Amino acid sequence: VSTRAVYSSSPNDYKYTNHDKKINIYDEEKNIIGQYHPKERNRSGSFKDLHLLQEVYYNTLKGDRFGLNAWYINSNRELPMLTTDYGDATDFENRQREQTFRSVLSWDHIKSNWKLGVKGGYIHTWMAYDYKREVAPDNWASMTRSRSKVNTFYGQAEGEYSPTKRWFFTANVSAHQHLVRSEDKNIILQDGGKAIVGYDKGRVELSGSVSAKWQPIDRLGMSVVLREEMYGSEWAPLISAFFIDGIISPKGNVMLKASVSRNYRFPTLNDLYFLPGGNPNLRNEHGFSYDAGVSFEVGKENAYKLSGGANWFDSYIDDWII
């Protein structure tokens, strides 16, 4: 059993020289005769964070381990103004608040050459962003009142199996149910007479993968990964990857490595619907990535060590989601 609590805070109130601004110096005829960087004071970067973590584990001493983990976060942070903003920081409030609770139940079964694990959990996040401006003394106008609630239920199962020292297999399957409501209470859009405030959506996400690693000799290893995903009701094509690495010279521990992988990514709910900036017509991102590299390491024990490497990578992506 383990219980941890962390609390941190800071007013972040300090003076600094703003090198992103320049103030002109004028003569009596309004000619610029010089410039200087102003000294300013940051008054809008305070934060208060509380983190709680509770862990409970039970080991049967027969290869089974059960666990319960729970996290809680309470955060209240001011967001500082840009250093190029010429407004008065005391006239604005830019604040983000968050409360997140995460819980996980787990079971692991471990044997000499295989392992099985199952997890299930729930995540709740409430997040608020407020942007206010003082339009008159003690009279604040709310420009943005963003509120988001995210509820996620998930389950995961994974396994590992090593029949010999030359082969290693893994498998993983997971399921997530996301329920998201995001809104700006200051903005109401109309769509055919129906009020839409941000978005209120849910989506099921499934993912499964298998991998095999083969080490024919001590200095060479190869692995293949196959993955399949489903978002909502749409399945991705089979996503594959191949990796290879080998030591070409034990002297200097010179190693070559390379990989090729297929990329496929569905847009997130924020990519599709978040206001402003969401695009419900986004297409799925897809492409291929390649990389190769070489590394070395030389040295003398308890005296010195020198290591280095060089890498090359290239990607071809269509419908890239930025």
What are the language-model segments listed below?
Residues 1, 52-58, 103-109, 155-161, ...:
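Residues on the lipid-exposed face of transmembrane beta-strands in outer-membrane beta-barrel proteins
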Residues 1-9, 22-76, 99-111, 163-169, ...:
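Transmembrane beta-barrel wall of Gram-negative outer-membrane proteins
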Residues 7-11, 72-76, 111, 122-126, ...:
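Transmembrane beta-strands of outer-membrane beta-barrel pores
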Residues 10-14, 43-49, 63-116, 122-150:
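Flexible loop and strand-edge segments within Gram-negative outer membrane beta-barrel domains
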Residues 14-20, 70-73, 78-87, 128-138, ...:
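Outer-membrane beta-barrel translocator domains and adjoining extracellular loop/strand segments
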Residues 59-63, 110-114, 162-166, 215-221, ...:
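Outer-membrane beta-barrel channels and translocator barrels
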Residues 91-110, 234, 248-249, 255, ...:
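Outer-membrane beta-barrel signature, preferentially recognizing the C-terminal barrel domain
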Residues 95-100, 110, 122-124, 130-223:
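Outer-membrane beta-barrel transmembrane domain signature of Gram-negative proteins
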